[in-house]
Regions:
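Bacterial Sec-dependent N-terminal signal peptides
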Residues: 1-22
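Cell-envelope and extracellular/periplasmic
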Residues: 20-469
Length: 469
């Protein structure tokens, strides 16, 4: 009996020593690889064994040697958009990846307004979803959703699978990401791969490493797994479980829709978001890749017991746009929902993110991608004159040459509704209640349906003062 056990143990050990090449789930059949790049691929094999990698697009065989733990990594020169292709890996036993496309790859991250699927949430639909899901079939649009995972230490793989876009897969996929990818497909004419790593209600801090959070002492880093009281809000927990495993997956850029959870902690958001983006760029080692994000949409946050005006968080997102290189912000002042934190118009969110990518990353001319932005204010007697930048097509109101969302205040810091009229790229603001204005605010509230535009895009809420309230 003992001899039989020893023989079985020896056979098991021999089998373990000759492990087949295995890959993280992100590398699997149906994947999209970034075209015209040196695309990273990594996995496990037999320890200290040469792994041969054959690629179908150039009939070349590459070799890489695994380390003592069996880990290996390699960068493949990828061709222009097209496919399908195959990759075969062999360390004595073959592993084959099939139906691979070359195209444009984007990471899509954030909280619930990124996670929200095309089918919507219960009682919370996506506008036009029924017909858009019906017409969603596109074999060259590939989707990968990373399953929620909150961990104390970084993990090496994720749960998910690559799927072609069709009504069944798109119904369960991020609406914001889908509409973004759909626009890229239609305008670039190449395969597109979308990787969604998002968790509703998640904090910005959760998507960051501990060393990036040193400048933010209020972010309490967990010292043990027991310290993860909130899976989606604990600092570092989602970076460890949902981002770290795909760091290095060669891609074009990132889209981000987050901020609602940070409203009550708004003063640090611009700096924190900047630190997060810089951190992601440092670990990805792809230089200053594009980072485009949605400004949170207006919503009455008092419904969820927030006492902080969310316009302060929108202001922080405006500041972040100036701090972060190679970025852009999609303004959603006209696409909110007063009594719902999950706006229905995800087609608008996806379109405006796509405008940024198509214009700023892919160089498509003739489209406006960035909203006009508050520049400065001057006071002439009882009238404030507000100027804007990025307003080549001047300013207009939803109902003509006026806006109903301006307020002015004097030295008493009390704001009063004001008359606002538009002349070219300036807005003139005046209130009979404030003979000597010193500050102006536009739509600076939790909920406001933005009514100020330039060249088809809404202008963010803003203020000219720096008062605490």
């Amino acid at each position: 009996m003992k001899k039989i056990l020893l023989v079985c143990a020896a056979l098991f050990a021999a089998g373990a020593a000759q492990a087949k090449v295995t890959l993280p789930k992100i590398f699997s059949d149906g994947m999209v690889m970034q075209q015209n790049s040196q695309a990273n691929i990594w996995g496990h094999a037999t320890a200290n064994k040469v792994v041969k990698i054959n690629v179908s697009w150039n009939k070349t065989t590459y070799t890489v040697k695994s380390d003592q733990q069996g880990k290996w990594s390699f960068s493949l020169d990828t061709p222009a958009a097209g496919g399908p292709h195959t990759i075969t890996m062999n360390d004595g036993e073959r592993t084959v990846l099939k139906n691979i496309l070359m195209g444009e790859v984007w990471i899509c991250s954030g909280q619930s307004n990124m996670e929200m699927p095309m089918k919507g949430f219960k009682n919370q639909p996506i506008e036009n979803a029924v017909q858009d899901i019906l017409h969603a079939t596109d074999p060259q649009l590939r989707l990968f959703t990373i399953k929620r995972n909150s961990t104390f230490t970084p993990v090496d793989t994720v749960t998910g699978k690559w799927q072609e876009a069709n009504p069944a897969s798109v119904r369960e996929f991020s609406a914001t990401a889908y509409y973004f990818g759909k626009e890229l497909r239609q305008n670039l004419g190449v395969p597109v791969g979308l990787i969604v790593t998002a968790w509703g209600g998640s904090a910005c801090e959760a998507w960051m490493r501990a060393d990036w959070l040193k400048a933010f002492p209020d972010a309490k880093i967990p010292a043990s797994p027991a310290d993860i009281k909130s899976k989606n809000r604990t600092p570092t927990a989602l970076y460890n479980g949902m981002l770290h495993p795909i760091v290095g997956y060669t891609m074009r850029g990132v889209i981000w829709y987050q901020g609602e959870d940070n409203v009550t902690r708004y003063p640090t958001y611009a700096n924190m978001m900047t630190a997060m983006v810089n951190g992601w760029r440092n670990v990805w080692k792809q230089g200053e890749f594009p980072f485009y994000y949605c400004q949170i949409a207006p919503y009455d946050y008092k419904l969820i017991k927030y006492t902080i005006n969310s316009a302060f968080l929108r202001e922080q997102q405006m500041l972040a746009e100036k701090k972060i290189s190679n970025c852009g912000m999609a303004v959603l002042m006209d696409a909110g929902l007063e009594y719902g934190i999950h706006p229905r118009k995800k087609n608008i969110a996806g379109l405006r993110l796509a405008l940024l990518a198509l214009n700023k990353t892919y160089g498509i001319k003739g489209i406006t991608s960035e909203s006009a932005r508050y520049k400065d204010v001057t006071f002439k007697g009882d009238t404030a004159v507000v100027s804007f930048e990025r307003a080549d097509m001047w300013i207009y109101g939803e109902n003509g040459y006026k806006s109903d969302l301006f307020e002015v205040a004097g030295d008493d810091h009390v704001f009063h509704p004001a008359k606002a009229w538009i002349e070219r790229s300036k807005v003139y603001v005046k209130s009979e209640e404030v003979p000597h204005p010193v500050a102006v605010r536009y739509a600076f509230k939790d909920w406001a349906q933005g009514d100020l535009f330039s060249d088809g895009l809404p202008i963010s809420s803003f203020r000219t003062d720096n008062w605490t309230e």
